[in-house]
Regions:
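Beta-loop-alpha module in the N-terminal Rossmann-like domain of NAD(P)-dependent dehydrogenases
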Residues: 49-112
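Short catalytic-loop micro-motif centered on adjacent basic/acidic residues
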Residues: 72, 93-96, 120-124, 231-232
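N-terminal Rossmann-like dinucleotide-binding module
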Residues: 1-48
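Short, well-ordered coil/turn segments that N-cap beta-strands
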Residues: 27, 52, 91, 118-120, ...
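A contiguous active-site-proximal alpha/beta segment in oxidoreductase catalytic domains
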Residues: 100-163
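Acidic-histidine catalytic/liganding microenvironments
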Residues: 24, 64-65, 129
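Rossmann-like dinucleotide-binding domain that binds NAD(P)(H)
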Residues: 161-241
């Protein structure tokens, strides 16, 4: 099988993926990109990535002729424009979640992927946790019986040290794939319709950041070609004040 060459944009969480690609038997060359030269060279030395595959400019990396694919692991506001750029540069593109924060942006990514004939992958991680794989195996082995209803919760605390300021007040279901993806995978289908309600209140500073006052959001989904109704709850702050 032909080996692929991959560029990783963002070396926070992205450093973990760069290391994985360096060890993957089907990956040949790995390029890395971050605006911080010190971080770039530190990670490059740790992983043995040659200097010619280290970039501080994203446009320069996606223009590299030898790269087959780009993996975007940057702050959320960069996901949409960087995904579009990579696709239009003729690269298969993977991006950490969320892929974008508006319906128009989501549709544009899908449209561009189809137009240029390159694969776009939304890199949702919750489908690969030990807990989810255990439940999935139970279903595949017939140990769950007929599923009548699905419900999921995903609670995080973005007020802890280490999370960027842009997370403060982030609307919970703008970041809903962690809770929804396992539900849809177990059901083996996609969502047909959704009704979402907000509950509780975050403090004024957080509410004003994105115009979302809710501490918790709850969504009820009708699933395509299924008699199952699914419910999902999302919260990004353990303490809202």
């Amino acid at each position: 099988m032909k080996k692929v060459n991959i560029g990783v944009a963002g070396l926070g969480f992205g450093k973990e993926f760069a290391a994985i690609y360096c060890d993957h038997p089907l990956v040949d060359k790995v390029a890395i990109c971050t605006r911080n030269p010190e971080t770039l060279n530190k990670v490059g030395e740790e992983l043995g990535i040659p200097e010619e595959l280290r970039f501080t400019n994203y446009d320069d990396m996606i223009s590299h002729e030898e790269l087959d694919a780009i993996h975007i692991v940057t702050p959320i506001k960069e996901h949409y424009p960087q995904s579009i750029k990579a696709l239009r540069a003729g690269k298969h593109t993977a991006c950490t979640v969320p892929m974008a924060t508006s319906l128009d942006e989501l549709r544009e990514i899908v449209k561009t992927s189809r137009e240029v004939g390159k694969i776009y992958t939304m890199m949702e991680t919750s489908l690969y946790t030990r807990e989810y794989l255990y439940v999935k195996r139970l279903k595949e082995n017939g140990e769950l019986g007929k599923i009548q209803y699905l419900k999921g919760d995903h609670m995080q605390n973005m007020s802890l040290e280490g999370w960027g300021d842009y997370w403060q007040g982030f609307p919970p279901f703008w970041y809903g794939t962690h809770v929804l993806s396992p539900i849809l995978d177990l059901a083996g289908t996609t969502a047909k319709s959704v009704r979402c309600l907000g509950s509780g209140r975050v403090n004024k500073e957080r509410a004003e950041h994105y115009g979302c006052p809710y501490a918790v959001e709850t969504a009820t989904f009708r699933l395509r070609n299924s008699d199952i109704v699914a419910e999902a709850h999302r919260c990004l702050f353990e303490r809202v004040f």
